[in-house]
Amino acid sequence: MAGSKEIRSKIKSVENTRKITKAMEMVAASKMRKAQERMRMARPYAEKIRNVTAHLSHANSEYKHPFVVKREKVGNVGLIVVSSDKGLCGGLNTNVLRLSINQMKAWEGEGKKTIVSAIGNKGFTYLNRINADVKSHVTGLGDTPHLEKLIGTIKVMLDAYIAGEIDQLHICYTRFLNTMKQEAVIEQVLPLSDDKLETSATTAKGHWDYIYEPDANVVIDELMTRYIETIIYHAVTENMASEQSARMVAMKAASDNAKNVIGELKLVYNKARQAAITKEISEIVGGAAAV
């Protein structure tokens, strides 16, 4: 059995670790609430631009934007992988990367090559390590991701789609369900599904008649790009909320485990102390008997 001094040292070490994990839990909880608020504030804009884009597309049915045209043959596929820049968030990044790799293998089995864009340092590092075809990446988004930082890497993938380098674009991220539950998902971004546009177009009754300046097609082109940027930005904000939730849960579990370890070490310490006292008493009694 370890000595009392050694056990006291272990208890102090675990207590210090628990203080750190408890502080990280509280910080993550605060950041999670802010991330949820950003998600809530972004929804009205995303919904409005989706509705306007759908209305314009249906009002100008003779013009088909490349983003809504399905290609007969799908060769290369684009995949945007959203991960975190930091760790200590449970299995969040592991789940996203596992899902991405499995999907890439499935596409490979169908004869499709995957071109990847990485958002977040953890995903970028891993994808480079497995020699994935990473066409663009962005890291260092911080706790408050801004669309301006994402536009560059989004544009690379959109240009690749327009140029025919990829025939589909998907995004893999962690969807925020609630504080205790997050889910890694893959969603198709391009081509835009008819269901999304049809649903948005039918939400408003009557005919929408727009006056365009300078030209209807130019307006639609610009709105389509903004709409795709909004979809990807929304996925990033959901991933951020999921990251902070997962980190809060992970740090709470670590704090609880540390508390249990401290309790067990204190029991061991008390037993060691009791054994030492019993030994001393036995020696004293034995010495007295000898006299």
UniProtKB/Swiss-Prot annotation:
NCBIfam families: ATPsyn_F1gamma, PRK05621.1-1. Belongs to the ATPase gamma chain family. Transmembrane segments: none annotated. This is ATP synthase gamma chain. SUPFAM superfamilies: ATP synthase (F1-ATPase), gamma subunit. It comes from the Bacteria. F-type ATPases have 2 components, CF(1) - the catalytic core - and CF(0) - the membrane proton channel. CF(1) has five subunits: alpha(3), beta(3), gamma(1), delta(1), epsilon(1). CF(0) has three main subunits: a, b and c. The lineage of its organism: Bacteria, Pseudomonadati, Pseudomonadota, Betaproteobacteria, Nitrosomonadales. Produces ATP from ADP in the presence of a proton gradient across the membrane. The gamma chain is believed to be important in regulating ATPase activity and the flow of protons through the CF(0) complex. HAMAP family: ATP_synth_gamma_bact. GO terms for cellular component: plasma membrane; proton-transporting ATP synthase complex. It is a peripheral membrane protein. GO terms for molecular function: ATP binding; proton-transporting ATP synthase activity, rotational mechanism. PANTHER family: ATP SYNTHASE GAMMA CHAIN (PTHR11693), ATP SYNTHASE SUBUNIT GAMMA, MITOCHONDRIAL (PTHR11693:SF22). Keywords: ATP synthesis, Cell inner membrane, Cell membrane, CF(1), Hydrogen ion transport, Ion transport, Membrane, Transport. CDD domains: F1-ATPase_gamma (cd12151). The keyword Membrane applies. It comes from Methylobacillus flagellatus (strain ATCC 51484 / DSM 6875 / VKM B-1610 / KT). One of its GO terms (biological process) is proton motive force-driven plasma membrane ATP synthesis. It is found in: Cell inner membrane.
